[in-house]
């Protein structure tokens, strides 16, 4: 799939290589800033999502921002999940560099930051001019992200997802 996408859109391949190299620099420098550490994945997702937009520059900008928010959340959640392995093997992990020494604390930190990214995403998503399948997209973008971010334990504070956006009637 990667080769096909790269053949169809060489600019995406250049962005992928550039952001991979930037991620390696962040790891080499032991970046402690969460936003800076997540930026390469956010940029990559932003580029991928902007390709899905119409030719309208505002729609393209919104889709880029949506992708960057998803990339930022994905990076942080991934680093929280790999926390124990990274700690055991002495690998780079932004949570370890910030003095977090417990996997559950890393997961909660990632969850809070991912929720902030999703709040940003929801604002950009609300500005999209979706003509078809709005209800389907609402389910994917809102409920799907909720499932990915909100932990399944009963002690967590539930998020009022429907208050984050105004879901339009068909």
Predicted regions and their residues:
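A structural signal for well-ordered alpha-helices, especially hydrophobic packing surfaces
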Residues: 49, 74-77, 125
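Inter-helical turn/loop segments and adjacent helix faces that build the functional surface
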Residues: 51-60, 128, 132
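Active-site alpha-helical segments that house and flank conserved acidic catalytic motifs
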Residues: 61-85
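Divalent-cation-assisted or electrostatically stabilized phosphate/pyrophosphate-binding catalytic cores
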Residues: 5-17, 21-40, 61-64, 86-127
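Histidine/acidic-rich helix-loop-helix segments that form or flank divalent-metal centers
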Residues: 59-60, 134, 138-161
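Residue-level detector of conserved catalytic or cofactor/ligand-binding positions
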Residues: 162-170
